Amino acid sequence: MSEEDGGSMSVKSSLSSFLKILSSYNSNVLLAALVFLLLVVLFVLLLHFYARFFWSPSHQDFSAAARHRRRRRRNRRRTVTTTRIIPSLPLGGFDDGVSSPAATATRDDKGLDSSVISSIPLFVYEENEEEEDEEEECVICLGLWEAGDFGRKLRNCGHGFHVECIDMWLSSHSTCPLCRSPVLAAVSDEENLKLAVNAVEEEAEVRLQMSPAGENESNVSGDRRVSLSLSVMEDDLKTGDDDGEEEVRIEVFDDDEEINDGGTRSDRRRSMSMTSSASSSLMRMLSSSSSRSERNKVFPTARQDSSK
């Protein structure tokens, strides 16, 4: 019996020691499994929040709009830099000491006067049924042309733009925004020097039908001839001042004779001064009236010789 009891005790002790070893091993494995599970749950939560805030459609639309705004701002800066710095080059390349009028206008671009801009002819856009597939757009505002839109067509190059767009452009530029050709015909320095040194005189002759107040046209005794003489003054050239306007002297010669104190007769003569812009308007009015009178064959204009 003693041997059997000793054998059973040894078996129990070995089993208890094995169970202790196994329990200690299971606790370490369980702890490692719990730590790994917590890491997996934390990673899944982070992935969920990332997908919710960065992959949502609203955030994608906001990001696309922000990228579009940055792209437009970058393209706008690039366009302005190209317009202001890079001049248009002649087709033949650079010539020694010679620059094209378009390049000169680009470097010294100060815009045009409002009266010059308003003189550019207008047109009304009409859609062409044969070219419906090709949509035309204004290169300044990048807007499509629609039927009934008003535009201006430049004389030299023939390009057309919206009235509001080209008026704003020409207020600070003097060239075409598409081909960079000058809007106004370039005048050489030699011609400018001749205009500044020599007094330019232009004469226009008109006839005025004068009748006293209260009388009929049948009682008109005759015609009255008035001769206008326009001359550009040289005061700006002598003094060195340049205010952008030339003074023009207008002398009016009247055929009606007046008697002086000595009993002699002399023609009436009056003179006045005005700016060159006002005188040019007066000359255009006189030329239009003279052309109408020539068409009607009534008192054709005649240019008097200054020597007489």
From Swiss-Prot:
A zinc finger (RING-type) spans 138-180. The RING-type zinc finger domain mediates binding to an E2 ubiquitin-conjugating enzyme. PANTHER family: RING-H2 FINGER PROTEIN ATL16. This is RING-H2 finger protein ATL63. It is a single-pass membrane protein. Residues 272-291 have a biased composition (Low complexity). It catalyses: S-ubiquitinyl-[E2 ubiquitin-conjugating enzyme]-L-cysteine + [acceptor protein]-L-lysine = [E2 ubiquitin-conjugating enzyme]-L-cysteine + N(6)-ubiquitinyl-[acceptor protein]-L-lysine. Pfam families: zf-RING_2. InterPro entries: ATL1/ATL16-like, Znf_RING, Znf_RING/FYVE/PHD. SMART domains: RING. Pathway: Protein modification; protein ubiquitination. It is found in: Membrane. SUPFAM superfamilies: RING/U-box. Keywords: Membrane, Metal-binding, Transferase, Transmembrane, Transmembrane helix, Ubl conjugation pathway, Zinc, Zinc-finger. GO terms for molecular function: transferase activity; ubiquitin protein ligase binding; zinc ion binding. The chain crosses the membrane at residues 29-49. Its EC number is 2.3.2.27. GO terms for biological process: cellular response to osmotic stress; protein ubiquitination; regulation of endocytosis; regulation of reactive oxygen species biosynthetic process; regulation of response to salt stress. Residues 252-308 are annotated as: Disordered.
